[in-house]
Amino acid sequence: RESSPTSREHAYLVAETFGVALEEVDITPMVEGYAALTPDLTPHRKGNVMARARMIVLFDKSEAYRALPLGTGNKTERLFGYFTWHGDDTPPVNPLGDLYKTQVWRLAEHLGVPEEVVRKPPTADLIPGQTDEADLGLRYLRADVILEHYLKGYSDQYILGLGFTEEELRRVKERVNRTHWKRALPTVALLSSTAIGEFYLRPLDYRP
């Protein structure tokens, strides 16, 4: 109910363009049922509830169809922690996870995604009028360049010398550093020498 009608139209447009089967599931009763029990629910928290409700449906449908659920988060969102924990970034396979937002745009253009979809302002569409760049206080076109240089170990002075401001650099570094927990497995209290993910490690799951 909170989503823009345009998002629904674009979903059907993309499905039609690529010949993809589409099934629409209304999560409004799920979300509003919880909201009715939680009178202090803020728009931000409700947005997280909606994202997690989508995942309930996605994983149930994947089991029903014996299919693999795919994630949609891109590298910029993941580095910024700009996603709902146990929401959009939950699926076991994420084809876009190592592509910055600007790279996703170029890939979309290359694949023939309709221009009105590629050019629309990025938004989670969980709160009316919300946009990614307003939330982040930074344009993706600038954020991605800073992120790439920061991850490769370039100095602050070098990055600032590319024409970015100290405030832009601070925002990027702060978001990356304070959201590391969202990109990691749950923290486990180590009580044995066989703790999973710490001492018990598999080099690679592989099928001959």
Where are these regions (language model features)?
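Catalytic subdomain that performs nucleotidyl-dependent activation
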Residues: 16, 46-54, 67-148
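Peripheral terminal appendages
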Residues: 131-208
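Short secondary-structure boundary/hinge segments and terminal tails
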Residues: 32-33, 79-80, 125-126, 167, ...
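ATP-dependent adenylation/nucleotidyltransferase module used to activate substrates
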Residues: 1-79, 159
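Short secondary-structure transition/capping segments
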Residues: 8, 35-37, 82-83, 128-132, ...
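Conserved active-site and cofactor/substrate-binding residues in soluble primary-metabolism enzymes
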Residues: 6-10, 29, 44, 53-56, ...
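Short coil/loop linkers at secondary-structure junctions
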Residues: 21, 114, 165-166
